[in-house]
Every structure is written in C-alpha cells, then in structure tokens.
Amino acid sequence: QELRKWMQTYPAVKTVPEAYLALAQFLQYQNNQVERLRIVREGIAGYPRYEGINQLKNIEKEILNASLSLEIATAYPGEQQSVKVNYKNLTGITLQLYKVNLPVTSAVLQNRTTHFESKYARLQREEHFSLKPTTDYLNVDTTLTIQAPQAGIYFLKAVPDGKKGVSDGTLMNVTALKTIYRPLPDGTLELVVVDAVSGQPDSEAEVTIYTEKGGGYSPQQTYQADKQGTLKLDFLNSNKYWYNAHTAADNAMPILNLWKNDYYYKESKRKEVLQLFTDRSIYRPGQTVYVSGLAYELEKESTRVLADKKYTVSL
C-alpha cells in the first residue's frame, strides 16, 4: 500500500517506473496476475520512454502467453483413459492421436525432436475439447477422457484453438500387461505377468531383459512365462534390470528398470504387499466395481501368499 501511495503522490520522479517493476514482482509472489497485468500496463502507458520499458512489456507478455502440457498414464486397450491437462489462456484444444511406427526399444522414443509425429507416426483420429477460460491468467489442471485404441505405442498431441507455438505432446503406451515381482531365496527374481485390469495371469507372455545402448535398449535374453504367467530371472551379473513383458499381439509395455536393492532386504524384515485389480479403469455412475487382489508377505529368505487375509477396500 505504501508503494502504491508513493507512486501516485510522486508520478514525476524518475525512479517511479522501478517501483512498477517492484510492485509487479510483489504481485507475482501473491499470484495475483490480474492486478499485476493492470500495474505493468499502467507503467507502460505512463512511462513509454523509460529505459527499462521492455521489462514491463516482457511481464505483460508473460502473463498473456498461453501454456499447455499433457500427462497420461499407461492405457488399457479399448478402455476410457484419463488425460491430465495443465493450461493457461486457452479456450479449447484438439487432441490428436498418432500411431507410432517404432519399436519400444528405439532411442528415438527417448529423445524426441520437433515434428516427431510427422516423421515417425500416422494420425489415427482427433477430438476437440472445450476448456474453461482462465480469466485470472493462472495455470489450471483439468482431466479429459478419451477411449484408448488397441495395444501399441502412440503419440498424443494437443493443438490449441487459434494458438501457435504452445502445442504439447506425450507418448502413450497402450498395453494390457502388468508385472508383479518377488525375490526368491536363491537370489533370483520371480515375475508374474498379469492382465492389468483383471489380474489374470498371462501364460503366453514373455519377458525380455535389455541393456542400454545408444539411448535405446538392446535385448539380451528372453524368458517364457509358464501356465501361471510366472517366470524366474537372474541378474546376469548386474545389479540393475531393464525389462518389459510382451506377447505376439501386445508389445507396447514400457521398458522398466529395477535395481536389485529395490527388493533385496539386508535385514530380516517382513513387508506386506497388496496388489489390487479392477475389471475396468473408468466407471460410469451406477456401475458395479469388481475388485480382486493378491496379498503376499516378503521376507529376506521367503515369500508367502497371505491366504484368507481380510482387507477393507474404500472407494
């Protein structure tokens, strides 16, 4: 308040424009972009010959600029999928879904360049979404819903209405596979490949071990799951895994890393683990939610299923 009063009382003082900058910074800390915009515009109009006028103009541009970012988790084929959107100064976007023509091991996926989708993907479909205007010039989060395509690697791109230079995109892995692991007394690792929604084991799945190479991944060894979707892995003289599960029809599971220390317990401490599964990823009002689970206990030298263990599941 004192700074504002001083600016109004002594408008002819040469240092007043500096006060506008200081006040704009203070309003930034308060996250009051509406008043901040008013102040910098007042300074620009009142002191057009100020040598630091571009600083005020840059603040005005920063406030008015649009911003956009996407975030999406691994999707399940054919299911409704949530897309997290963070944006500012936009009223609508078009989500474009591209099918990527690269294997999951490709270095290009990890180091995407400008116009990635035009070089390595083909447009499958697009859908427009309206966004609530951000009249306070602040970034907001919202969640949109799309239907996931069939298993594969995709690129999801958001193109703003009437705005250029602020589009954003992210990889979207669509797979029905998920892995659960547990350590065994002999130092190996047991993996179970299951359906990510139902939790049912996948006996047709394989797990491949990779090493990093040139920004991508080079396959080293592949293991076949048994009828229970289970297989055992050795660490191959390494303390770290890069691996993924795949089938003939589903080879889009992201390549994951797992350090040996993530599950190796130096002390004999028990750890209870619970994995929950539902029959679908998104529900409509009134639908029944079917839940199944796998509960087991980890110890340094043993792993055992917790039979008849009771849990309370809350929605």
Regions found by a protein language model. Give the residues of each.
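N-terminal, cleavable Sec-dependent signal peptides of secreted/periplasmic/extracellular proteins
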Residues: Q1-L315
